Amino acid sequence: MLTQLSIEIISMTDKKYLFTSESVSEGHPDKVCDIISDYIVDDFLSQSDPENNRVALETLVTTNQVVVSGEVRGPDGFECNYEKLAREAVKWIGYEQEKFHWENFNFTSFVHGQSSDIAMGVDAKDNKDQGAGDQGIMFGYACKETPVLMPAPIYYSHLILQNLAKARKEKTISGIQPDSKSQVTLQYEGSKPINCTEVVVSTQHN
């Protein structure tokens, strides 16, 4: 599970230019938070009547600390075990370090029920009356530069970290930890990538 952190807006001309994309691994603090939040959202979606369940959640991670906060709404009688899900997520990522271990990190929850005012706005049956709440959705674009229809710099940046994670989990490379980052710079001519000019990979290690 990787993310593109920055996008440079450029004009597509016949001139040559450089375009750089960056990826972070599942062990990067930003992604740890994303994955914990995803585990919780998935739990709500697995319950009855998922279309009426609501999750607006923030996760904070620091040295041996995980904090979740926000507001939710699930079916009557449903109690989400936030701590269990957070530990499962961190275990899946692979953190078993002295300063951050899935078994013994300190967990705090400040999650509460959804505001009735927000519920009233987002629950309207008529689309004309339906509000947007305060959550947004980010989006990207598809192109023909790669087989998966992603821009080439971010595709190769992702691919590097996927192989690094595989090597770590299969122990073909020893001593590396979950937090890593890659950056790939390609040279373009017009709208076509023609050359790789720089690759940077950094990883947490023993």
Regions found by a protein language model. Name each.
Residues 50-60, 172-178:
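Short, glycine/acidic-rich hinge or "gate" loops at secondary-structure transitions
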Residues 28-31, 82-83, 117-119:
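N-terminal low-complexity, intrinsically disordered segments
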Residues 1-11:
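Short, Lys/Arg-enriched N-terminal segments with co-localized hydrophobic residues
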Residues 20-23, 64, 89-206:
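Glycine-rich, mobile lid/loop segments that gate access to catalytic sites or pores
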Residues 10-54:
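N-terminal, positively charged regions that mediate nucleic acid binding
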Residues 55-75:
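Short, charge-patterned binding micro-sites
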